[in-house]
């Protein structure tokens, strides 16, 4: 695992501008490629910071106006903030958040889902990039597969629209991880 100690450009300038907009502490619960690349060291392109939560909610509109796809900060830096509404995180994910780049910003607090929770947010979409991210995380952490299964069963499965499909997806993911470990 090769996490970044310093945010590279254009991320640093983009997030510094968001930090200046915030009058008090703002927490961004980050998921997706931004977390996998910046915190866990995967080398792949990403142009957005996927966020599950902007807290307090009162700043979400201000952030949306300037930082979303097509907004002024996107025009300036080519990266954007994406408020994700379709990814389902495990129920207790907030209890396991970890801060990314502590003390980098005055008001902005970037929080990352733990690697198991991060992987499980990718379960429903299950595109190739998601599967590659999960296999990468499973390799570098390395995942305890029983913990992944348990968290899925207890904290995610009860809240899914099609749990039987996601049962199969998780089973296939675990088989792929086990194959990677055997080779």
Where would I find each of the regions flagged by the language model?
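Compositionally biased terminal segments of proteins
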Residues: 1-183
């Amino acid at each position: 695992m090769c996490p970044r100690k310093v945010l590279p450009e254009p991320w640093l300038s983009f997030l510094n501008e968001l930090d200046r907009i915030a009058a008090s502490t703002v927490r961004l619960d980050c998921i997706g490629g931004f977390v996998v690349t910046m915190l866990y060291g995967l080398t792949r392109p990403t142009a957005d910071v996927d966020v599950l939560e902007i807290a307090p909610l009162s700043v979400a509109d201000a952030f949306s106006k300037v930082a979303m796809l097509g907004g002024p900060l996107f025009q300036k830096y080519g990266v954007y903030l994406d408020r994700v509404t379709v990814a389902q995180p495990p129920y207790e994910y907030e209890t396991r958040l970890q801060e990314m780049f502590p003390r980098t910003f005055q008001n902005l607090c970037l929080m990352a889902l733990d690697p198991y929770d991060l992987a499980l947010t990718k379960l429903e979409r299950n595109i190739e990039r998601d599967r590659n991210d999960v296999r990468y995380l499973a390799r570098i952490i390395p995942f305890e597969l029983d913990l992944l299964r348990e968290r899925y069963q207890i904290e995610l499965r009860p809240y899914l629209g099609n749990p039987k499909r996601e049962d199969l997806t998780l089973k296939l993911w675990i088989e792929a991880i086990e194959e990677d470990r055997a080779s």
